[in-house]
Amino acid sequence: MQPVPAAVRNWLIVVAGMIFFMIVLGALTRLTESGLSMVEWKPVTGWLPPVGEQAWQAELEKYLSSPQGRLVNRGFDIDQFKQIFWLEFLHRLWGRLIGLAVALPLAWFWLSGRLSPWLKPRLVALLVLGGLQGALGWAMVASGLVDRPSVSHYRLAAHLLLAVALYAYTVWLVLELGRQDLRHDDAKTMRKATALIALTFVVMTWGALMAGLRAGASHNTFPTMSGYWMPPGLLELAPWWINLFENGTTVQFVHRWLAAFLVLGVLVLAWRARRPEALAAGAMAVVQLGLGIATILTGVSIALATLHQAGAVLLLTILTVVRHRATASRPRPLSAMVAG
C-alpha cells in the first residue's frame, strides 16, 4: 500500500484546532452561565435558531420554566435571553460541525483507500468518542434542569476531561503521522512527561470541580487563601474525603497545590531535558501559573479564566509533544506513514 497522504494529517490538524476552539468556547459558555439557556436537546433538528418573534418568545418561556429561569433570571426579556442563548447555540453548533468534520472526511478517505489498517480503528474511535462527548454534554445540561439552577460539577468535570482527552488523542495521531526523525530515545524524559501529562489531567479535574462549585470566588488572595495557608473549613463536611470534591474551599486548596507541583515538575523536566520542546513546556507552565494567579486575584475574570483553561490545554499539547519525541521510533508498516 501507499503511504497515507499528507491530506489526512492536515485534516486531523484541523480537527484538533476545532476541538481546541470548542474547549475555549465551552469555557466562555460556562463562565457566562449560558449553558442552561437551551432546555431541549435536538441533535438532528437543532441546527437552526428560533426564527421570528413568536419562536423566540416560545424559547424564552421554556427557559423561564427551568430552574435557572425561575430562580435566577426570572425577569429576563427577549434581548437578555438572546445574549445567553447565542453562546450556547454556537457551542452546540460547533460540536455538530466537529462531528461532520470528522465523519465526512473519514468516509471519503476510507472509501478512496487512503487510510492504513493501523489508522482506521483509531479514527473510528475518535468518531465514536466524539458522539459520546455530545451525549455527555446533554447529560451535564440535564442535571441543571431538574431542581437547581446549576449543572452537576461532576458531570461538568467529566465533560471537560473527555473533550481534552479527545483533543490530546487527536494531537497524538497528528504526531504519529508526522516526522519520525524528530524522535530521540530518552526513556527518562518519556516517563517524566507521561507522569506530568497524567498530573495535568488531575489538575484540570480539580479546576473543573472548582468551576462547577464556583469556588474560585471564595478566596481571592495569593499565595495565601484569605490570609491562611490552611484556611478554616477544609474538613467541615463528613465524611472527611467528601471535602475533596464538594467543599469549595478544599477544592480550591487542592487545585492550587496540585498546580504548584505540576509547574515545579515541568520546570525540572525542562531543566534536565534541555530540549526546545521541554523548554517550551517550562515557559508555558510559568505562563499558566501566572494566568491562574491572575484569575484568582481578579475574582475569576471571564477573560482570564478562559485564557487559563486555554493555557492548560496548550501546556498539555506541549507535554504531549515532549513525550512523543522522547519515545523511541517504532517500526511501522509503510501504510501507516504520511507521504509528503
Each model region followed by its residue ranges:
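Polytopic transmembrane helical bundles with strong interfacial aromatic enrichment
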Residues: 1-340
